[in-house]
Amino acid sequence: MPRSQRNDNFIDKTFTIVADILLRIIPMAPGEKEAFTYYRDGMSAQSEGEYAEALQNYYEAMRLETDPYDRSYILYNIGLVHTSNGEHTKALEYYFQALERNPSLPQALNNTALICHYRGEQAIRQGDPETAEAWFDQAAEYWEQAIALAPGNYIEAQNWLKITGRFGE
């Protein structure tokens, strides 16, 4: 049984109902509908922490989806799963692929910045301030791009940029 038919979460059920209505009324090719169904099931599995199942659904959605913009969101969500699993290198690969297809994806830029910042903190703990600064500078670049795309978002990142003197460098 598809995951979308066994949701217990109210928000997931609501999303599923709205998505099913849209699938019926918006004209799209059968492959696109099937890709969206896998994407929706992947999001549902991901929200429940079922990451292996989410990845299976996202990979199937990628196989079927042809639109680069839609593929960017699938790739972004695959990156989220890898981030949740602590697989930051893999996550970055998927965030970069998402940004190649959709450069206006501030959440992918933000998550890339978060990983760079995390790596900077790791370098500090390991006693390597030069490497830490390089990671923090990279984080700043990605956050500035994300903030440029979504000025009202990422307030904590904006504060960090100001406090560390990296805002607008």
Curated annotation (Swiss-Prot):
Q: Which organism is it from?
A: Pinus thunbergii
Reading the lineage from the top rank, the first entry is: Eukaryota
Which stretches are TPR repeats?
35-68, 72-105, 120-153
Function in brief: Essential for the assembly of the photosystem I (PSI) complex. May act as a chaperone-like factor to guide the assembly of the PSI subunits.
- Family according to the record: Belongs to the Ycf3 family.
Q: Can the keyword Coiled coil be found in this entry's annotation?
A: no
**Cellular location(s):** Plastid, Chloroplast thylakoid membrane
Q: Name one GO biological process term.
A: photosynthesis
This one is known as Photosystem I assembly protein Ycf3
Q: Which UniProt keywords apply?
A: Chloroplast, Membrane, Photosynthesis, Plastid, Repeat, Thylakoid, TPR repeat
Membrane-topology annotation of the record:
Peripheral membrane protein
Gene3D superfamilies in the cross-refs: Tetratricopeptide repeat domain (1.25.40.10)
Principal localisation: plastid
Question: Pfam families per the record?
Answer: TPR_1
List the InterPro entries: PSI_Ycf3_assembly, TPR-like_helical_dom_sf, TPR_rpt, Ycf3/AcsC/BcsC/TPR_MFPF
Q: Which GO terms describe its cellular component?
A: chloroplast thylakoid membrane
The record's section on SUPFAM superfamilies has: TPR-like
